[in-house]
């Protein structure tokens, strides 16, 4: 999996590409840890090129959401493809995360 990190204004954008599973979650954990060094981090996770997410990937996102909330930050997700969106729906994660169809609408929610 590839992780691209960029910052636009005060929003940290994490773009995921490939598969997020048990073999790749450590890299995403490190990325989140770096961002959580700042209190109140605003994070947009762009999933446009995320092909698959496993339960390990879901746990990573859930842990990040909890850490973000503790630090008065916020995480939103954008551009989930149909397969990934279905995994979020089946697992109930659509109730946990704010999910948007575009980066622009996700950024506006931050």
Regions found by a protein language model. Give the residues of each.
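Amphipathic alpha-helical interaction surfaces in cytosolic regulatory modules
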Residues: 22-96
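Acidic phosphotransfer microenvironment of two-component signaling modules
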Residues: 82, 104-105
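Short acidic-hydrophobic, aromatic-tinged amphipathic segments that line or gate anion-handling sites
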Residues: 98-102
């Amino acid at each position: 999996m590839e992780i691209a990190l960029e910052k636009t204004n005060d929003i940290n954008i994490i773009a995921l590409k490939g598969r997020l599973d048990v073999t790749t979650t450590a890299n995403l954990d490190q990325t989140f840890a770096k961002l959580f060094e700042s209190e109140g981090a605003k994070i947009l996770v762009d999933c446009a090129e995320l092909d698959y997410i496993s339960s390990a990937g879901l746990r990573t996102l859930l842990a990040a959401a909890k850490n973000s909330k503790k630090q008065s930050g916020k995480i939103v997700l954008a551009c989930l493809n149909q397969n990934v969106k279905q995994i979020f729906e089946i697992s109930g994660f659509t109730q946990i995360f704010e999910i948007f169809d575009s980066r622009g609408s996700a950024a506006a929610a931050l």
